[in-house]
């Protein structure tokens, strides 16, 4: 469980209080500039706490050292780039400790490449992959740490529709063994895949809770200035238009 108490970050976040349950796929949503990335980076410990606290179960983030943060949290930034000439195997290996024996390294990489369906790509140069293939490999790199919490910033933004769905399916498959928190703009995919939503409006918490309760007509109008057709039975949001 992640508990956020009275979290304030400069001009980006203002007195955020919420609890994110363990083992769920949780979407962080809001218009551009609402504070989604800032919230993720603060939970990850990348941005220092200015005011308030983030708790992982009963452990405060402010008391965790770099090793403890790495053990608890895996973070995948938006548009993460690999600039070196590495194979897919080498990229996934970046998520492992350098001191891990080679035999264990090979075993773990084989297991996680199978999990994310990239085994056939292991010897291929990472830079030659498609955007969707790169996304899978990057997710495997993060998940191979086996941290209980995975934070992902806008993972589907650069992907085509097939790989957008694929990425959400991959994240969903990690629950309930892991808690996955993802910043996401895509309303219909968030509505379909996320268990819960944290909805931000101009740095403030507008709503938090089960997806169908949060992504209702009133909240969509407040957060995004749009109207849409919502079908809770089919888990779809369609016919989105400006107010």
Predicted segments — roles?
Residues 125-129, 133:
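Conserved ABC ATPase signature
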């Amino acid at each position: 469980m992640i508990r956020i108490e009275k979290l304030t970050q400069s001009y980006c976040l203002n007195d955020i209080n919420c609890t994110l349950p363990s083992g769920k796929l949780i979407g962080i949503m809001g218009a551009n500039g609402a504070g989604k990335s800032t919230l993720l980076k603060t939970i990850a410990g990348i941005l220092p706490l200015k005011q308030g606290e983030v708790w992982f179960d009963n452990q405060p983030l402010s008391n965790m050292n770099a090793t403890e943060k790495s053990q608890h949290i895996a973070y995948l930034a938006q548009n993460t780039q690999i600039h070196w000439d590495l194979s897919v195997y080498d990229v996934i290996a970046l998520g492992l400790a350098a001191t891990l024996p080679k035999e264990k390294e090979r075993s773990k990489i084989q297991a996680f490449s199978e999990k994310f369906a990239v085994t056939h790509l292991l010897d291929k140069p990472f830079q030659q992959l498609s955007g969707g293939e790169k996304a899978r490999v990057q997710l495997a790199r993060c998940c191979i740490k086996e941290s209980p919490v995975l934070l992902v910033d806008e993972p589907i933004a650069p992907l085509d529709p097939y790989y957008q769905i694929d990425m959400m399916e991959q994240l969903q498959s990690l629950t309930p063994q892991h808690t996955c928190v993802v910043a996401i703009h895509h309303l219909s995919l968030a509505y379909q895949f996320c268990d819960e939503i944290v909805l931000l409006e101009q740095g403030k918490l507008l709503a938090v809770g089960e997806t169908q309760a949060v992504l209702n007509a009133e909240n969509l109008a407040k957060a995004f200035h749009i109207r849409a057709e919502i079908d809770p039975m089919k888990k779809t949001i369609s016919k989105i238009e400006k107010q």
